[in-house]
Amino acid sequence: GLIQTIKEKLKELAGGLVTGIQS
């Protein structure tokens, strides 16, 4: 559903931020 899609996108964004901070 829509909620699941939003959760997936938030996970991707969060992962990108973590990667950016670490590097």
UniProtKB/Swiss-Prot annotation:
The keyword Secreted applies. GO terms for biological process: defense response. Expressed by the skin dorsal glands. Keywords: Amphibian defense peptide, Secreted. Its main location: secreted. It is found in: Secreted. The keyword Secreted applies. One of its GO terms (cellular component) is extracellular region. Has no antimicrobial or anticancer activity. Belongs to the frog skin active peptide (FSAP) family. Aurein subfamily. This is Aurein-4.1.
